[in-house]
């Protein structure tokens, strides 16, 4: 079983969408993967953005029960791979002690995944699609 962590800022938009999408793709492809998400500035227990929930639901992914987790509450060494949404997140995780060889920026060809926070549903759909495509490519490498 491979443990994967997705990290963004507040753990209410990008990283929970990534977790849900990864879980669905892993299930559909029968891959032994466990996904988790967290945020560098998360308020533990905060709900996921309604637009993130709606955008994922359109793909048959239910993230409505996910709650925000601060990354400092996790043992980063327990993860086989850590995907961040920006180069800034990557640098912050390495500063917190994450193994730099395990940390990658999701959607690197675009410099990461843009934050949809505060955007409309179409903004979240574009973000979801970028995350989906990036994870689909990344799973081939695991």
For the regions a protein language model found, what residue spans apply to each?
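Helix N-cap/beta->alpha junction signal
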Residues: 75, 86-87
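Phosphate-binding/catalytic loops
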Residues: 81, 87-142
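Conserved active-site segments centered on acidic
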Residues: 1-77, 140-142
């Amino acid at each position: 079983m491979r443990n994967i962590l997705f990290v963004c800022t507040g753990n209410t938009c990008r990283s929970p969408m990534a977790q849900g999408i990864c879980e669905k793709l892993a299930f559909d492809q029968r891959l032994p993967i466990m996904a988790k998400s967290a945020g560098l500035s998360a308020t533990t227990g905060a709900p996921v953005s309604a637009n993130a929930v709606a955008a994922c639901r359109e793909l048959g992914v239910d993230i409505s029960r996910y709650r925000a987790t601060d990354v400092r509450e996790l043992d980063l060494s327990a993860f086989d791979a850590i995907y961040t949404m920006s180069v800034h997140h990557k640098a912050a995780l390495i500063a917190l002690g994450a193994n730099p060889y395990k940390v990658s920026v999701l959607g690197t060809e675009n410099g990461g995944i843009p934050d949809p926070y505060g955007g409309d549903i179409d903004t979240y759909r574009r973000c979801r699609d970028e995350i989906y495509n990036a994870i689909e490519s990344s799973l081939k490498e695991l």
